[in-house]
């Protein structure tokens, strides 16, 4: 049986566990596994781009729903203005008080992004960031992971189920399976990102 949807995953998990009395628990095991792989995977399929306008005098803005990690951020100006990460302490130290201008730095605190200096006008900032995969449910029956890496879902869900079943001897088996599935997926995605070409670093003059 192919594992390519929420329902086929639940059926496969029940079959592999040889249990027919876990229909209420299996969705919980799936959700726990989703929390795990969203923390560790950083794939191209997780990348999103969003454009937001700043407001003059407003220093902080909400991060997008599902935000996991920043990949790149810049102001959509001509030429493009790079915005560099700073720790919160450094951001406050440099731009304390009422200083304002075109943002050149940012920091993340909680679920907000803070700019320094405080924007003095409306600037469009463009974020490329990693977003959590959408969770599977009865109304959202597929996502990228279940279609492209069903082993991550299967092994991870089985791993979450075994402690509930007090079947500790099976935990290392599913743990190894999940670890290998995640490692293989991340390694292949890293290779595909560069299409087999050598990674080069641009110097300060803009040349390789």
Language model features with spans:
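Glycine-enriched, solvent-exposed interface loops adjoining structured elements
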Residues: 1-208
């Amino acid at each position: 049986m192919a594992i390519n949807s929420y329902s086929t995953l639940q059926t496969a998990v029940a079959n592999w566990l040889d249990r027919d009395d876990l229909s209420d628990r299996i969705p919980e095991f799936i959700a726990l596994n989703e929390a795990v792989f969203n923390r560790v995977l950083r794939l191209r399929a997780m990348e999103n781009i969003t454009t937001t306008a700043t407001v003059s005098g407003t220093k902080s803005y909400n991060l997008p729903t599902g935000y996991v990690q920043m990949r790149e951020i810049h102001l959509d100006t001509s030429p493009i203005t790079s915005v560099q990460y700073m720790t919160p302490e450094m951001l406050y130290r440099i731009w304390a008080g009422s200083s304002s201008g075109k943002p050149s730095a940012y920091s993340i605190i909680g679920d907000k992004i803070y700019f320094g200096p405080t924007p003095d006008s409306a600037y469009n900032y463009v974020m490329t960031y990693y977003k959590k995969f959408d969770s599977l449910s009865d109304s959202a029956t597929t996502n990228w992971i279940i279609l492209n890496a069903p082993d991550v879902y299967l092994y991870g869900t089985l791993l979450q189920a075994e402690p509930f079943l007090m079947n500790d001897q099976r935990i290392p088996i599913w743990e190894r399976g999940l670890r290998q599935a995640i490692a293989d997926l991340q390694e292949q995605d890293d290779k595909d990102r560069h299409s087999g070409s050598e990674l080069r670093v641009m110097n300060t003059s803009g040349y390789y």
